[in-house]
């Protein structure tokens, strides 16, 4: 990325929507080193505010000035502002929730390794786990019939026969693992 930032004569935008769940460092500390760097983040993931549709853009003063000139006036409504402020005042709570999700993600991945029809568990720095299975549509429908909602990603590019499991609470993850184990036995 640094090579691109140094050589590319244009903007380089880094989407850090899931940065709070990642072991990677944010690019924010390098923002002043690269005038063409733009970093976007969201309050949808770690902060759990997907419904308010609020993101943050970090960039040089020059880029922010251009963005301010082209954005609509009053583009963030008062209710969104209030909800964002309320949640931002609970940063320690959010950090604890993220830490819990990261721990649950590790546990979930460990347990998924024993499911026979899971062919690949992809590395993740998110609040979900992407897996390749023997037959995504079949497994998706079986899980739905057990009352478990997952995402069938088989129609997405490079995700043929993949399911996406959102990392839940310990109880939710155990329910998922139990259902997967039952399906593995019954095949």
Language-model-detected regions and their locations in the chain:
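Active-site pre-lysine segment of PLP-dependent enzymes
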Residues: 1-12, 16-46
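PLP-dependent aminotransferase class I/II
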Residues: 36-114, 120-121
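Short acidic/glycine-enriched loop/turn segments that link adjacent beta-strands
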Residues: 51, 125-126, 157-161
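PLP-dependent enzyme catalytic core of the Aspartate aminotransferase-like
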Residues: 145-146, 156-187
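Short beta-strand-to-loop capping motifs
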Residues: 59, 131-134, 167-169
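Conserved PLP-binding catalytic core of the aspartate aminotransferase-like
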Residues: 101-102, 115-146
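Hydrophobic C-terminal alpha-helix "anchor/cap" residues
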Residues: 31, 112-113, 143, 180
């Amino acid at each position: 990325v640094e090579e691109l930032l140094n050589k590319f004569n244009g903007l380089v935008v880094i989407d850090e929507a899931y940065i709070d769940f990642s072991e990677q460092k944010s690019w924010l500390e390098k923002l002043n080193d690269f005038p063409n760097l733009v970093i976007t983040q969201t309050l949808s993931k770690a902060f759990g505010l997907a419904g308010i549709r609020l993101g943050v853009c970090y960039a040089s003063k020059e880029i922010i000035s251009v963005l301010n000139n082209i954005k609509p006036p009053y583009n963030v409504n008062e209710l969104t502002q209030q909800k964002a402020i309320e949640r931002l005042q609970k940063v320690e709570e959010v950090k604890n929730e993220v830490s819990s999700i990261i721990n649950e993600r590790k546990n979930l991945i460990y347990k998924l390794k024993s499911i026979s029809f899971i062919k690949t568990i992809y590395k993740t720095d998110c609040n979900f786990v992407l897996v390749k299975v023997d037959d995504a549509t079949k497994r998706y429908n079986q899980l739905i019939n057990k009352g478990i909602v997952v995402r069938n990603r088989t129609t997405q590019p490079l995700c043929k026969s993949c399911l996406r499991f959102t990392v839940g609470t310990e109880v939710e993850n155990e329910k998922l693992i139990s259902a997967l184990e039952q399906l593995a036995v019954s095949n």
